[in-house]
Design a protein with these regions (language model features):
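Alpha/beta enzyme core
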Residues: 6-54, 58-67, 72-180, 186-208, ...
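C-terminal helical cap(s) of enzyme catalytic domains, especially alpha/beta-barrels
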Residues: 199, 213-243
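Basic polycationic patches enriched in arginine
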Residues: 235, 248-249
């Protein structure tokens, strides 16, 4: 993490359903390498990539998976040992608090956390309030983040709660860094504004996938995100320049 802040680009979406923008992941990796701090990939992508071994970015191996047919029911599909074998710098797990298989997901994350501690490998926990009748609000996001913290996660990824004030409650409820997820594809202006407000709330950075790899210029949007994340501009100052459209070389 540069100055305690980070830009992570998850690209683990392909196992869920066909997703535009990651047909050729190596192409995206080349475009954002040296800009993003790390990427999140599944083991099959790493094994078959012609680029991962040489990239400058950190590699986070994702251990959880589900398909769109049972989206919230995550299972473990890889291991800490496999992550080490593939040269990963960290692992990630996904827990949906409120899902039908919540108990199993919590158990798995706790066990993996202990293994990570044993091997000296950081664990990113993707923590979400998801399941039948589960609302996404400040309290449920706080709870999900806290579950990850209690299980031993080194960094938490969770959804933005809609305002600086509410997301600050999430950040303050755990004692490990929190990065904000990008969520569904959105406009550049909305993305930048959400990230700016999350950073003002005390976020440690972002973990943004679709809004990067589905962008017409992935390198440019990563540069724009980095500028916001590493900026200390006051909240009222407007976003200056169209960094997204043209980028900076």
């Amino acid at each position: 993490m540069k100055d305690g802040k980070t830009v992570i680009v998850p690209m683990d979406h392909g196992i869920t359903k066909p997703v535009a923008g990651i047909e050729n992941i190596d192409d995206v990796l080349r475009k954002i390498d040296g800009l993003a701090d790390a990427v999140v990939l599944h083991k099959g992508v790493v094994k078959n990539s012609a680029y991962v071994e040489d990239m400058e970015m950190g590699l986070i191996l994702h251990l959880s998976a589900s398909t769109a047919y049972h989206l919230n029911e995550k299972v473990i599909v890889s291991s800490v040992e496999k992550a080490i074998e593939l040269g990963a710098d960290a692992v990630s797990v996904h827990v949906n608090v409120g899902s039908e298989s919540e108990a199993e997901q919590i158990r798995d994350a706790g066990i993996i956390s202990e293994l990570c501690d044993s091997f000296g490998l950081p664990m990113l926990a993707m923590m979400y309030p998801r399941g039948h009748g589960i609302e996404v609000n400040t309290e449920t996001v706080k709870h999900a983040a806290r579950v990850g913290y209690e299980l031993g996660a080194d960094i938490i990824k969770t959804c933005y709660t809609g305002s600086t004030e509410s997301f600050a409650e999430v950040v303050e409820y755990v004692s490990v860094p929190v990065v904000v997820a990008g969520g569904e594809k959105k406009s550049e202006a909305e993305l930048i504004e959400d990230v700016r407000n999350a950073m003002l709330a005390g976020a440690a950075g972002v973990a943004i996938g679709r809004n990067v790899f589905q962008h017409s210029n992935p390198a440019s949007i990563v540069k724009a995100l980095k500028r916001v994340i590493h900026s200390s501009k006051p909240r009222g100052e407007m976003y200056e320049g169209n960094l997204v459209a043209g980028g900076r070389r």
